């Protein structure tokens, strides 16, 4: 049986369109808020509202899939995200956008969970890793193309919202021509998410996902604002964000190979150390291109390596619950990161964005170094 079946290819095609829309809004919303003369802490709170929606969406989607299946859950989540996009044009204001970004966050998280769960159920133990790798590549390529779009098209609010909403709805079309079946549903309800979060031997992976959420949530939510405060134009901001994301794309395959060859613990240590170096380099402002590149290459690949670490520590039938727990951990980090970073930037200096990223990374590095002699054999492979 082929790994990349027709339903899988159509699912990933729809995801690519949705990711384009998500990436464009994630870059432009902080800039639109700044243009409305909102304070830095308000920008951070709106970003956190989006990630709060992610948290709620992640918790709800399992129930939705069980009730209406993968296809209808995908349609519903796309419609919710489209509503969150269109709603931004109804009324411009802090409280209004706080609500609409929450709605968009719910829809976005539901899309992620539906697609990830569909791929898990479509695959086997032999090809599931390739399916999830394809998913991550599509996600990052879509994000990269979205950043390029920002640098090439008008960034005015009412110019962007119509085609972004249309792109979201177009992402539904591929799934109209296929049906994704849940062939292994009976194996997915045996383990609770709470049990996975409490699993001691997987704690490094869970903590890694939280740290990854803090780092990427802060970069996604506040890097455009940081560059804007430095006098960078909107078009150039899109370019620099594309540099950041492209580094994450290019880093996926080699870092994954290195983790398989030399062990995930060693690779995690090196990744976190490189994130610290990249953050320090950003403070100097002397070489932003290489600094952003190494930040992207190390930061964007931290989540999959930490996820693989945690998944090694569980039985095969627990993999889905563990993946859900890791996504929740990442979302919590994404929620905390922008809020705390925005408060520091508002009250002290924009440079504290990178000091905060370096600090939490250093704490995680200490956790990794404490486990120097603890390298248990893997139980499950995806």
Curated annotation (Swiss-Prot):
Molecular function per GO: transmembrane transporter activity
Transmembrane segments: 14-34, 45-65, 79-99, 102-122, 131-151, 157-177, 204-224, 235-255, 270-290, 291-311, 325-345, 348-368
Membrane topology note: Multi-pass membrane protein
InterPro entries: MFS, MFS_dom, MFS_trans_sf, MFS_YcaD, MFS_YcaD-like
GO cellular component term of the entry, any: plasma membrane
Location(s) in or outside the cell: Cell inner membrane
SUPFAM superfamilies: MFS general substrate transporter
Membrane topology (Periplasmic): 35-44, 100-101, 152-156, 225-234, 346-347
PANTHER family for the chain: TRANSPORTER MFS SUPERFAMILY
Name of this chain's protein: Uncharacterized MFS-type transporter YcaD
Protein source organism: Shigella flexneri
Record lineage: Bacteria, Pseudomonadati, Pseudomonadota, Gammaproteobacteria, Enterobacterales
